[in-house]
C-alpha cells in the first residue's frame, strides 16, 4: 500500500542516539556535504515547501531529523559534513551523532537506502568519498 504523502510530519529532531525512533518503520537517509540540498530534496520529494528547514547558510541541520511519511516510511535528514561556520566542538558532535546513526542505531535493520548527494558543481570531494566508503 502506497503511503499518503499528505500525511507527513517531523517525528523527531534527534540530538542523541537514544532519541532515534524505536519502531521498525523503514528508513531512507539523505547524506551529503553541508548545503548540498538534502533538506530541499526532502521538501521537493514530498511536495512541501517548509517541512524540512532550509537555509542558505551551511550547517543549519544540527540534529538527525526523522520525517514520518504516513507511519510507513521515515525520510532521515542527516547533518551535513564539510564546511559550516560552527565551532570544532559542534562539528565533532554532529560527526559523532551521524556515526551513531550508522553504528549504534538499534533500528539499523530498518535502513533501506542511503542517498548520497554530491554537488554537481564541484564533483565528489574527499569527504564525499569517505562517506561513500563508510
Label every model-predicted segment.
Residues 1-89:
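Conserved G1/Walker A P-loop phosphate-binding module
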Residues 92, 96-134:
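Conserved C-terminal guanine-recognition region of P-loop GTPase G domains, centered on the G4
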Amino acid at each position: 500500500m502506497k503511503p499518503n504523502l499528505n500525511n507527513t510530519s517531523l517525528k523527531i529532531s534527534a540530538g542523541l542516539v537514544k532519541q532515534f525512533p524505536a519502531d521498525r518503520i523503514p528508513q531512507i537517509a539523505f547524506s551529503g556535504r553541508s548545503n548540498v540540498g538534502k533538506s530541499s530534496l526532502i521538501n521537493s520529494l514530498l511536495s512541501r515547501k517548509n517541512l524540512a528547514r532550509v537555509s542558505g547558510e551551511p550547517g543549519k541541520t544540527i540534529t538527525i531529523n526523522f520525517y514520518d511519511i504516513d507511519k510507513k516510511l521515515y525520510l532521515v535528514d542527516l547533518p551535513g559534513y564539510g564546511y559550516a561556520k560552527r565551532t570544532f566542538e559542534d562539528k565533532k558532535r554532529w560527526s559523532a551523532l551521524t556515526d551513531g546513526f550508522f553504528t549504534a542505531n538499534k533500528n539499523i535493520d530498518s535502513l533501506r537506502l542511503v542517498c548520497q548527494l554530491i554537488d554537481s558543481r564541484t564533483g565528489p570531494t574527499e569527504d564525499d568519498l569517505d562517506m561513500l566508503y563508510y
